């Protein structure tokens, strides 16, 4: 097994070297037949080594590249496989297209390096009203009889469910025309499909605006359910000649309360909307407007929702308070009573589980920002039911994550500055090149785990072991970072500082154990522990006693840590893209 692994690694190394040479030879190879394949619909865990094992038996592979996100370095779900000759690549498509790779059917097609070829309308067709069971393979098999297919795909949502439409790109325009003539209006899995030329987004938008400006189809709702088809026809007949008048009904024949009218002339449709909308018919006001497609209605609803959300955010800006570390005995009524002296409360809510158990936090909304500010000043850190409250302005989740990420970055810079200052102090004391790094509580291992163990980052930093002892070579000389042998005086600032350090260390060790059990990542666990330890001790202790409160802080800190990692990788990602 070790030999196979070494062999695969060696082959991949050779491939990467060959891949670097491709850029210089690409112009010389432009006239040769393509031997490059696009492999899509891959599971995120699929690597270059995995693909090499699958494609190398077909023929000599010159290079493989799994495309990854520039920041997170996670797979984008597709890759490029380059063979030494065209015939091997063609065989790979014939034998491996739509075969499962880690549980997902891969989609293989010829790689089109020229974006103009991928985006051109010639040979590209659009198919809609597809049955949910039609997948990429079924679509390919259906249309491949008309000619060589460069690419085909059924559009899917985030869950992998078909959206009911897809695309097929033929090598020849004649193949696309034949497919449109033969399959448009035909039944596929019991559904009549539409097949037509693919239009660019600009062309579709232009056509859509033209259709809106010259609409003839009218939608009417809020119709009395006792209305007959004849009465509905008579209602709209006075506006002009119609192609169709449909009053929608259930399978049982019951009136659904809405219908559609398609006029021959656009002017008649406009007249119907203007004169019939908001008029009363059989005791009910009618809603009459241009008939819209489902996608258009969804877009409008989305815009309305966003506008309402932004308006709500602006309305509650600076007056909505977030309160945490609440005792389980505090309910909505008691929470309102606690904050009532500071102003007019419009709402007070303690968040609970499905079983009605308090989650330990809640929200109080005042009528003015001044009242909210006063409540923060008076109630923050105040003991209520034996617990110190944390009171602050409520923030959106994305804002909290951004602020936490900034805090992490600032904390790391401070630690780096502390390390530099310690190095300078050590040099001034006659120890050039040597210094005692500060204790990094944020990267403290659990008991029994060596500090310089598997984490290479901390080992390289030379961080101090958790007992604060310096390296062995200094033990016979001055010891920095630990109290003198005589110990601290029982009273005074030094004793208080020593006690706080011990308390922080104990809390850090306990937090690290819990966090490491969830992340199984030493670096992540250390950083998250350090973030939580930045809170005052009186806020950290309740986290160890309340699992739900701990889980809430852990999720927020984890999200902030991930955001920070992405920000740190940003410059590398940009350089990689430019390269």
Swiss-Prot record:
Q: Which domain of life is it from?
A: Eukaryota
Spell out the subcellular localization from the entry.
Cytoplasm; Nucleus
Q: Where is the signal peptide?
A: none
Give the RRM domain ranges.
35-113, 123-200, 216-293, 319-396
Q: Name one GO cellular component term.
A: ribosome
Here the segments flagged for biased composition (Low complexity) are 566-579
Cite the PABC domain residue spans from the record: 487-566
Disulfide partners = none
Q: Which SUPFAM superfamilies match?
A: PABC (PABP) domain, RNA-binding domain, RBD
Q: Where is this region: Disordered?
A: 1-32, 560-579
A Gene Ontology molecular function term of the record: molecular condensate scaffold activity
Record keywords, A-Z: Cytoplasm, mRNA processing, mRNA transport, Nucleus, Repeat, RNA-binding, Translation regulation, Transport
Name one matching Pfam family: RRM_1
Gene Ontology biological process terms, A to Z: mRNA 3'-end processing; mRNA transport; nuclear-transcribed mRNA poly(A) tail shortening; regulation of nuclear-transcribed mRNA poly(A) tail shortening; regulation of translational initiation
* UniProt biased composition (Basic and acidic residues): 1-10
Keyword Plastid included in the entry's annotation: no
Question: Which CDD domains does the protein's record reference?
Answer: RRM1_I_PABPs, RRM2_I_PABPs, RRM3_I_PABPs, RRM4_I_PABPs
The record's function comment reads: Binds the poly(A) tail of mRNA. Appears to be an important mediator of the multiple roles of the poly(A) tail in mRNA biogenesis, stability and translation. In the nucleus, involved in both mRNA cleavage and polyadenylation. Is also required for efficient mRNA export to the cytoplasm. Acts in concert with a poly(A)-specific nuclease (PAN) to affect poly(A) tail shortening, which may occur concomitantly with either nucleocytoplasmic mRNA transport or translational initiation.
Q: Which family does it belong to?
A: Belongs to the polyadenylate-binding protein type-1 family.
PANTHER family per the record? RNA BINDING PROTEIN (PTHR24012)
* Name of the protein described by the UniProt record: Polyadenylate-binding protein, cytoplasmic and nuclear
- The gene for this chain is PAB1
């Amino acid at each position: 097994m070790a030999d196979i692994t070494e062999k695969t690694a060696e082959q991949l190394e050779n491939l990467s070297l060959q891949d670097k040479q491709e850029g210089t030879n690409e112009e010389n190879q432009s006239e040769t037949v393509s031997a490059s394949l696009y492999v899509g619909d891959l599971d995120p865990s699929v690597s270059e080594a995995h693909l090499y094992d699958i494609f190398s038996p077909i023929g000599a592979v010159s290079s493989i590249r799994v495309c990854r996100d520039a920041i997170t370095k996670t797979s984008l779900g597709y890759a490029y496989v380059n063979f030494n000759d065209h015939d091997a690549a063609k065989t790979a498509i014939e034998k491996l297209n739509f075969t499962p790779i880690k549980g997902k059917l891969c989609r293989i097609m010829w790689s089109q390096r020229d974006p103009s070829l991928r985006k051109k309308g010639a040979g590209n067709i659009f198919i809609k009203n597809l049955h949910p069971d039609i997948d990429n393979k079924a679509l390919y098999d259906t249309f491949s009889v008309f000619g060589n297919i460069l690419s085909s795909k059924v559009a899917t949502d985030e869950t992998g469910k078909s959206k009911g439409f897809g695309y097929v790109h033929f090598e020849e325009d004649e193949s696309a025309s034949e497919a449109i003539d033969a399959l448009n209006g035909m039944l596929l899995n019991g559904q009549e499909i539409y097949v037509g030329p693919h239009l660019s987004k600009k062309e579709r938008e232009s056509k859509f605006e033209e259709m809106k400006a010259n609409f003839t189809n009218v939608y009417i709702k809020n119709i009395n359910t006792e209305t007959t088809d004849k009465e509905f026809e008579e209602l709209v007949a006075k506006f002009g000649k119609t192609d169709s008048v449909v009053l929608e009904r259930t399978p049982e024949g019951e009136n659904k309360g809405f219908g559609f009218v398609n006029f021959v002339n656009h002017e008649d449709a406009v007249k119907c909307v203007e004169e019939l909308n908001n008029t009363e018919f059989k005791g009910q006001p009618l809603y009459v407007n241009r008939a819209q497609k489902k996608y258009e209605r969804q877009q409008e609803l989305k815009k309305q929702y966003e506008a309402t959300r932004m308006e709500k955010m602006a309305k509650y800006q600076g007056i909505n308070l977030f309160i945490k570390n609440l005792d389980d005995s505090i309910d909505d009524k008691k929470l309102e009573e606690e904050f009532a002296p500071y102003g007019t409360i419009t709402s007070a809510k303690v968040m609970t589980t499905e079983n009605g158990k308090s989650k330990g936090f809640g929200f109080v909304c005042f009528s003015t920002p001044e009242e909210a500010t006063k409540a923060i000043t008076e109630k923050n850190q105040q003991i209520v039911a034996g617990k110190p409250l944390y009171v602050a302005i409520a923030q959106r989740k994305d804002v909290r994550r951004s602020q936490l990420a900034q805090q992490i970055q600032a904390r790391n810079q401070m630690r780096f500055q502390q390390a530099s200052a310690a190095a300078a102090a050590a040099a001034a004391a006659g120890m050039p090149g040597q210094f005692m790094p500060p204790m990094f509580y944020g990267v403290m291992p659990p008991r029994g785990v060596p500090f310089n163990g598997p984490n290479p980052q901390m080992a390289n930093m030379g961080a101090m072991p958790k007992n604060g002892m310096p390296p062995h070579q200094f033990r016979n000389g001055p010891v920095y970072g630990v109290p003198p042998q005589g110990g601290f005086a029982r009273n005074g600032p030094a004793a208080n500082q020593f006690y706080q350090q011990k308390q922080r260390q104990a809390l850090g060790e306990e937090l690290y154990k819990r966090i490491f059990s969830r992340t199984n990542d030493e670096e992540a666990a250390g950083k998250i522990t350090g973030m939580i330890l930045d809170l005052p001790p009186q806020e950290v202790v309740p986290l160890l006693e309340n699992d739900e409160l701990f889980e809430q802080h852990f999720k927020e800190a984890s999200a902030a840590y991930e955001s920070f990692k992405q920000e740190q990788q940003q410059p590398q990602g940009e350089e990689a893209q430019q390269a």
